Amino acid sequence: MRHYEIVFMVHPDQSEQVPGMIERYSATITNAAGTIHRLEDWGRRQLAYPINKLHKAHYVLLNVEAPQEAIDELETNFRFNDAVIRSMVMRVKHAVTEASPMVKAKDERRERHDFASEANDDSEAGDSEE
């Protein structure tokens, strides 16, 4: 089986349906004896340019190993689902399992914020002891 990287963008008004979509598309891959190596929900993000007069979309990234029939079924589902405003399926040479740069940057920001919060908590605790 081949490895694919799949990104699809969902209409921002349909963001609450994204978990169901992810579940449905994941089931399509696993039912066809495929494997999901990485699944990332990037959330609602600003678009580089308007698509159908929209300026934001909900992004989802999948790295999968699946047969061609499963990929064809996914592309058909994307095409006929009005909530999916754009999708892209690319074949890649190897399975990608590490976190994407988007998630790494988000984790770094979270760690910095947590570290800053801990530093503030420590300084406040030191002030109250005096």
UniProtKB/Swiss-Prot annotation:
Source species, domain of life: Bacteria
Keyword vocabulary terms for this entry: Ribonucleoprotein, Ribosomal protein, RNA-binding, rRNA-binding
Sequence ranges of Acidic residues compositional bias: 119-130
SUPFAM superfamilies hit by this protein: Ribosomal protein S6
Annotated source species: Yersinia pestis
Functional summary from the UniProt entry: Binds together with bS18 to 16S ribosomal RNA.
Signal sequence region: none
Highest classification ranks of the organism: Bacteria, Pseudomonadati, Pseudomonadota, Gammaproteobacteria, Enterobacterales
InterPro entries: Ribosomal_bS6, Ribosomal_bS6_CS, Ribosomal_bS6_sf, Ribosomal_S6_plastid/chlpt, Transl_elong_EF1B/ribsomal_bS6
Gene Ontology cellular-component annotations: cytosolic small ribosomal subunit
Protein name stated in the entry: Small ribosomal subunit protein bS6
Family: Belongs to the bacterial ribosomal protein bS6 family.
GO MF: small ribosomal subunit rRNA binding; structural constituent of ribosome
